[in-house]
């Protein structure tokens, strides 16, 4: 293992502008931001075992982890700083804060993100498909939605009652499947986005009431209705394209 592991770090560059304007006798705020983040020295775990000739990949092949070539003392896993990511995001936000005079507030935020990573890991540190990160190239970041829209609103219904709602919409997130259709020794990591254009959607509603006890003490009761329309957000896809002459029908 690497006995001189580094602390992972990120460099972030941001540029934004915020404005206030009047619309419908109300004060609104708009935000536009561009953010670029590069992360370095993430912790990775890769296989240290090699074939009898010292190679990681099979002769003439571009794929094939040497799992069956354990030395007499067992399997070797190497811990290093090879994980890197980079992402560029655009944030558009429109906000009308709640005020006692208007009795309502609203917020709308849209985020576009272009993310890349140099491993096939999904929140973990494993890098077992290749001998090092240089073989992966830049793959779409897993778990990051390219498009995300969040809308929220609150309204004072009177008599101490407050009603609110929140809507979240996300595009389908990338997954990195294994494609061995070209041969068992020439598999590739083949990114794809499952399902339709919307990968996640949820609408939540809430109602609350505040009670004044006539002293310095107040208490509030709140009821939440989560995922109002019982939308199904699927997960756990089959990330296997198939092998030579045997494509995955799914």
Regions found by a protein language model. Name each.
Residues 41, 45, 158-185, 197-202, ...:
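C-terminal beta-signal and adjacent terminal beta-strands/loops
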């Amino acid at each position: 293992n690497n006995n001189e592991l580094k602390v992972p770090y990120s460099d972030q560059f941001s540029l934004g502008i915020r404005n206030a304007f009047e619309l419908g006798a109300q004060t609104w705020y708009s935000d536009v931001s561009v953010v670029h983040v590069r992360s370095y020295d993430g912790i990775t775990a890769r296989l240290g075992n090699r074939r009898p000739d010292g190679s990681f990949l099979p002769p003439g092949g571009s794929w094939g982890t040497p799992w069956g070539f354990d030395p007499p003392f067992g399997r070797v896993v190497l811990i290093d700083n090879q994980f890197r990511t980079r992402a560029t995001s655009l944030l558009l936000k429109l906000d009308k804060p709640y005020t006692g005079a208007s009795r309502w507030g609203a917020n709308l935020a849209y985020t576009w993100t272009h993310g890349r990573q140099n491993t096939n890991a999904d929140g973990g540190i494993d890098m077992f498909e290749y001998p090092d990160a240089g073989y992966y190239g830049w793959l779409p970041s897993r778990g990051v939605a390219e498009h995300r829209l969040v809308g929220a609103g609150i309204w004072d219904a009177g008599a101490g009652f407050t009603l609110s709602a929140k809507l979240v919409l996300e595009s389908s997130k990338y997954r990195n499947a294994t494609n061995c259709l070209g041969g068992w020794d020439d598999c590739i990591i083949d990114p794809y986005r499952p399902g339709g254009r919307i990968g996640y959607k949820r609408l939540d509603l809430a109602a609350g009431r505040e009670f004044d006890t006539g002293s310095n003490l107040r208490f509030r009761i709140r009821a939440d209705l989560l995922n109002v329309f019982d939308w199904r957000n699927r997960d756990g896809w089959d990330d296997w394209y198939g092998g030579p002459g045997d494509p995955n029908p799914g």
